[in-house]
Amino acid sequence: MIDPDGFRPNVGIVLMRQDGQVFWARRVRRDGWQFPQGGMNTDETPVEAMYRELREETGLLPEHVELLGATPGWLRYRLPSRAVRRNERQVCIGQKQVWFLLRFTGDESHLKLDHTDTPEFDHWRWVDFWYPVEHVVMFKRGVYARALRHLAPIAQNLAGPAAVGAMPERALEAWLPGSSAAGHDSPRKRPRKRSGARPMRINND
């Protein structure tokens, strides 16, 4: 299912403990780490897709989590050109996502990465709330930053401002929200500092 602009509907999952740490997993046979995410089926709502992906990728059931909130509307990112399959009938140039924040209420024994015959992840750990922004694959950093900025106030209400904190300045400097008709994030060069210059403002979209 790809929209007219070439973006595939998708859901992303931020699974958080009471202390503000989030679930971070390594992809099978790859060095990359990321949040659970996956494409939506044509007959699914975003919430239905989220619970299905949660079960497939982590083994967790709805009773093991509490849905705290979600990003409003779609957040988009483009795939790198090398990952775009131009010979397909419908060309997918990226993902448009709804991101969900879940509180983990179960036991770690409920986490089963091999729940399906084709697992997505082979290892997991808990990390600080903002850690993924700087450590996910480069082309996803913009959308991770936007998603976590939307969800941070909800996370702070649960874990407390000290546990979640603010997005690190180095992450904001490395990735600034891009602007385009498609609404995706684009990497920008780090601005040079000038004496007496005012700090660059970041739009909270």
From Swiss-Prot:
Question: Which EC numbers does the record give?
Answer: 3.6.1.-
Motif Nudix box: where? 38-59
Query: Which stretches of sequence are listed as region Disordered?
Result: 177-205
Basic residues bias: where? 187-196
Q: Which cysteines are joined by disulfide bonds?
A: none
Q: What cofactor does this one take?
A: a divalent metal cation
Q: Where is the Nudix hydrolase domain?
A: 6-149
- Superkingdom per UniProt: Bacteria
Looking up InterPro entries in the UniProt record yields:
NUDIX_hydrolase-like_dom_sf (IPR015797), NUDIX_hydrolase_CS (IPR020084), NUDIX_hydrolase_dom (IPR000086), RppH (IPR022927)
Enumerate the UniProt keywords alphabetically. Hydrolase
Class in the EC hierarchy, top level: hydrolase
Can you provide one Gene Ontology molecular function annotated for this UniProt record? pyrophosphatase activity
Function noted in UniProt? Accelerates the degradation of transcripts by removing pyrophosphate from the 5'-end of triphosphorylated RNA, leading to a more labile monophosphorylated state that can stimulate subsequent ribonuclease cleavage.
Q: Which family does the record claim for this protein?
A: Belongs to the Nudix hydrolase family. RppH subfamily.
Q: What is this protein called?
A: RNA pyrophosphohydrolase
Per the UniProt record, the lineage of the source organism begins with: Bacteria, Pseudomonadati, Pseudomonadota, Gammaproteobacteria, Lysobacterales
